Structure formats: C-alpha cells, structure tokens
A protein has these predicted regions:
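Hydrophobic residues within alpha-helical transmembrane segments
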Residues: 50, 94, 131-134, 160-168, ...
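Membrane-interface helix-loop junctions in multi-pass transport and translocation proteins
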Residues: 156, 164-200, 214, 232-253
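Interfacial segments at transmembrane-helix termini and the short loops linking adjacent helices
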Residues: 37, 86, 103-136
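Short alpha-helical transmembrane segments in multi-pass integral membrane proteins
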Residues: 84, 89-105, 184-207, 223-224, ...
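Alpha-helical transmembrane segments of polytopic membrane transporters and translocases
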Residues: 18-58, 90-94
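Helix-loop junctions and terminal segments of transmembrane helices
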Residues: 55-77, 82-85, 146
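Alpha-helical transmembrane segments
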Residues: 142-153, 202-219
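Membrane-interface junctions at transmembrane-helix termini in multi-pass inner-membrane proteins
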Residues: 134-164, 175
Length: 254
C-alpha cells in the first residue's frame, strides 16, 4: 500500500526527473499518473516473483531433516540435534548462495531472456532484482532459522524476529522511496535490510535457545565463496556466448 503512494509523492515532487528517465514508459502508459502503479507492478511481477522462486526450491532439500530435528530436540539428544541442524544449514547454503548470487549477477539477462517481450518492465525491475539477489544470502539464513524454531516448539521466535524487521522495512520505505533518484529500488533495499535483521536476530536466538555453537559463519564461508565464483564465471561466460543464447531464445520465446 505504501510503495505506490510513496512513488506518487516522488513523482509529484520531481516530475522532470521521471519524465527524463521514464519518458517511453510514460508515453506507453498514457501519462505519468500511471507510472507509479506500473513500477510497482513491474517490481512485484518480475523482480519479486523471480526472487521468491529460490526459497521454494531450497526448502525442499532441508525439509526432510526437520522431523528428525524435532525428534532429537524432544529426546534431548544434543549431538544428533546439532548434526541434523548442520545438515539443513549446509544444504540450504550450498544450494541457496550460488543461486541467489548468480541471479544477482545475471539479473537483467535473466529477465530479458524470460520476458523478452516486456522490455519496459525489465528496465524497471533489473536493478531491484540485482539488489534482491544479493540479499538472498540473508533470506537463506532467516528462513532456515525460522524453520528450526518452529520444529523445536519456539514458534513465538519467528514472530518476534519478523515484527521489528517489518517495522524497519516500513519506515525505510516511507522515508526513502519518495526520493526520486532511487524510487522503486528502495523497496528491494528495505527487503534486504529486513531479512538481514531477521537473520542476525535468528543467529543469536538459535544459539541462545539451544546452547549450541553451530559455527554458522564458518559454515557459510565455502558456499558463499562458491556463490561468488559462480556469479563471476556466469558473467564471464555470458560475455562470450550471450549473443548466441539470445538468438536461440528468440526462436522459442515470444
């Protein structure tokens, strides 16, 4: 609700900026009055949709261990509990980090490949998807922590962690989206900040509740490094074969 209103405020405060940067979109939409809704729709329809595909995918790999985590916690078997939690953390890190960082590195190219007939939406959404991809590291952490809290009977903790994060996101949106130069991209930044806050709180809460040091930072190092390598290599490879990929895609995608 707040994002379109803040965008409209930014549009009214500096119409010249938007007229210069989004002139083609304004013409296609029949006037600047529809620009805010167009930008918000592009963000939610493209950037957010692509971003949320990955947690749906990664959740499948760690979900099988959750009943075993609950059983080990109920029986008080600390060693088995630590081992199963470590399995979930590693699987989510190994799969999630490369996917998110690769999505960030290839944000515009992925959107252009999948939505080749919607170039105006892509132009609005590409930067937001780049930012969201970087923040996927925090989403991977926070979603893992929330799943663990739920299976050990601490369903109150996700709520306690999410409420401050959502409050920060709301405040950040209200005061920054209305700045014309950054506009809709702030929605992605505020989302990353929210997940970072939830991940940080979840990190300390998990160790405080369980009394176990899971060495999470150390376990993140290798998957995170692998994700960075994947992102860099994808950019390099695309530089060589990008035109060929686009040509082939044009034959099959509308």
């Amino acid at each position: 609700i707040t994002i379109p209103r803040c965008l409209n405020f930014a549009l009214s405060s500096d119409p010249g900026y938007f007229a210069a940067c989004f002139s083609d979109i304004i013409k296609a939409q029949g006037g600047a009055v529809r620009l805010a809704n167009f930008m918000y729709g592009s963000y939610t329809g493209l950037s957010w949709t692509m971003f949320m595909l990955i947690p749906s995918f990664t959740a499948m790999f760690g979900r099988s261990a959750l009943p075993q985590i609950a059983g080990a916690w109920t029986l008080g078997n600390r060693n088995e509990f630590e081992r199963k939690v470590t399995v979930v953390l590693r699987s989510n890190f190994v799969i999630g980090f490369p996917l998110y960082l690769g999505l960030s590195a290839m944000s515009r190219q992925i959107l252009e490949f999948l939505f080749s007939g919607r170039q105006q939406e892509v132009s609005v959404s590409a930067t937001s998807l780049f930012i969201l991809g970087l923040g996927g590291v925090f989403l991977t952490l926070s979603s893992t922590f929330i799943s663990i809290f739920q299976v050990i009977g601490r369903s109150d903790l996700p709520v306690k962690l999410m409420l401050p994060g959502c409050a920060v996101k709301l405040i950040f949106n209200v005061f920054t989206i209305s700045v014309p130069a950054i506009n809709i991209n702030v929605a992605a930044v505020s989302t990353v900040i929210m997940y970072a806050a939830v991940a940080l709180g979840g990190y300390f809460a998990l160790e405080n509740v369980t009394g176990i040091d899971f060495h999470i930072i150390r376990r993140m190092a290798v998957p995170l490094s692998a994700g960075v390598v994947c992102a860099v290599v994808s950019r390099i490879v695309y530089g060589f074969v990008g035109e060929s990929v686009n040509a082939v895609a044009a034959l099959f995608l509308p």
